[in-house]
Amino acid sequence: MSQEDVLAGLGEIIQEVAGIPAESVKLEKSFLDDLDVDSLTMVEVVMLCEEKFGVSIPDSEVKNLNTVADAVNYITSHQ
């Protein structure tokens, strides 16, 4: 799956759980500062990403996913 596909899928997930329009989800955006995705919402985002993309994202890695690019890179490198 390409980075663009993962970004689009992640945008859909964030729109679903946080109400942020998918087109606003860009690589440079910070989950907390730009998209207002707090730690509780992030747990839901991670669970849905694991289901959608077939990856496992351990709790120890979640704290390193600060931006959309961090998440996209993690997902694409672990598929």
Please place each PLM-identified region on the residue numbering:
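Two-component histidine kinase catalytic core, primarily the HATPase_c
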Residues: 41
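Phosphopantetheine carrier-protein modules
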Residues: 17-36, 52-66
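Thiotemplate assembly-line natural product biosynthesis machinery
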Residues: 1-23, 77-78
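Short, cationic-aromatic polyanion-contact patches
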Residues: 68-76
